[in-house]
């Protein structure tokens, strides 16, 4: 308590305590991860967590670090191939935290993940403090509110997603800059932080824009913002300027997203107004009272969209008691209105989706913004001694009652499959543990309120110490549930990815282009090998991949996972080797797949070669129309596409004379033996050489007659092609792949990739930065003149 007292001995006024908050949050975050780093370190591993953190974040950061340093625009290791900017701008391209890691060798990146996480916690706490100190009179309580934000349930939960914390960390600075611009007429910072937040993550920025509108309207309606036409115009200018400065990645992302079916998923009928399950409402309600469970688990409720949604507004120790008190005693304050509006938004699907461009997929990944306001409201009320004596006790009693009411779900009789059990929770022990920890926080807060008078001036320090200490405890519980819940599954993660990559690359040939398959292995193995792998986990790959895969029997949402039974896809996509973890060999053998021969092995993998491998780039003797292809089942589509090239009616008119129309008899010959013959035919028609580059690819072809050459590369507007130096039309065939017409004889084919819209985006951004620099210089000069005139 002495340490806390020294840190908090100064009250309102004086110099900023930003760095005190920063280092407190950094230290607690470091302590939070330290035990798990030690456990992983004893196994000779870097810290790995679970789910998306392992499958995406570690591999993305490592791969992107190396890719950026080597330069280029097209990533062959991303699924079937995708533009780097479009594939990774949602995850890391604009993140200042990612750019910091570029100071390190890419091989060190996995070990940099925890320091970066600690930095994000610290930056989040520091930013929250800077924003809150305007509204919280006592600096000591500003520190408490900032630490509540830094270690809120939302922040701890989203360690799982890592890059979400970038948004949590940077948002408070933009909100502070808005307050400064309106209330103090300090205009320089707001465009800068708008640009930083937009550049950091365009998707989350859309939600931030909605929240800022809510915040702005409530502040004006509540009389805190005194608005006139001149000020409104200045804010509009700064907003547009900030968006222009930060739009470097926006246009390419927008051009890609409008083609992505995951982003175009509107509501229908009742879906606008009510969730499909009553349990969704209960889950939202209890997310304010119970510490968050692991993102990939369901416990208290089984129906509804609950996993991976970031649905939590839990605050350590204080819970939502401060928000309840604030809304009762300061109901006309803008913060009370903001929290009430956000509460309504959370319970109405279409309003919830405003933060995600009206997409009907449920997420709660905007909760960090009202949580920030909730933390400020808590700090503002805790500094009032009279409220701690009266209102807080009642609010805490209500919080305790609501938290304990969840016990009903653990005790209600439940009949399933003729057997009656007690409770409907999926894992009773885990639920009781979560409840116990949540109630421990309630109990600690009760003790703090009970001894408030005895603590007197040390009360803020005591609350801060308990909040940080309890954050460590509940954070450990959450991290442990999440990490060790998949401990067995992820036991070999480091060995079979980063550690095994050099051994695999030493065995696999590199003299010719081919793709890999990875049978039931860890996600994104191809990134560690820097090779194209048809098993891939990324939500924002080239949109044509999401168009192509469903037509050939592969569900493509966030993953590409073609089943082993779809053997014909391996030929179509030039898959030469399948990597099978040794512990999965029995499952692999049960598939009874023909045409695969064991050719090598490494410490963890057996390597099977595809005897029906077809090199990249080949031609056809036949084509099939879209109408005829629609009669083919998804499971047989790959077989048919090895026989014929799928063309639109317009393409048939232009290129139909080069090939014959596939007959029904030929279309129905889809046995394995037919597939082998088709692979042989395609192999004989393949280009003589194919070279993948970081800006596209080149190929050499020797054709007997003019024909379309298919490359199983996802179609992208960023590609241009030349054949023998002459610009050629890039055709979109096979529902998402690329082809180009080549003449008879020898041809040199060059495909060059430029990220569509990137040049224009960067130009706008650069121009806006120049305008911003001039504008800031003018503001600075004007300020100096005013100061000199006053002097």
Task: Give residue spans per PLM region.
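Periplasmic/ER-lumenal interhelical loops and adjacent helix-loop junctions
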Residues: 52-64, 96, 232, 239-329, ...
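Membrane-interface helix-loop-helix junctions at transmembrane boundaries of multi-pass membrane enzymes
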Residues: 225-233, 322-346, 455
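Active-site lumenal/periplasmic loops and adjacent helix-entry segments of GT-C-fold
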Residues: 36-172, 196-203, 283, 294-307, ...
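Contiguous transmembrane helix-bundle modules in multi-pass membrane proteins
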Residues: 185, 204, 335-496, 744-791
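Membrane-embedded helix bundles of polyisoprenyl
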Residues: 29, 117-134, 140-222, 234-254, ...
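Active-site-proximal, structured, solvent-exposed surfaces of multi-pass membrane proteins
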Residues: 10-14, 60, 657-791
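Hydrophobic alpha-helical membrane-insertion signals
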Residues: 3-4, 9-86, 483-523, 527
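Extracytoplasmic/lumenal acceptor-recognition loop(s) of multi-pass membrane glycoenzymes
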Residues: 86, 466-492, 503-575, 613-675, ...
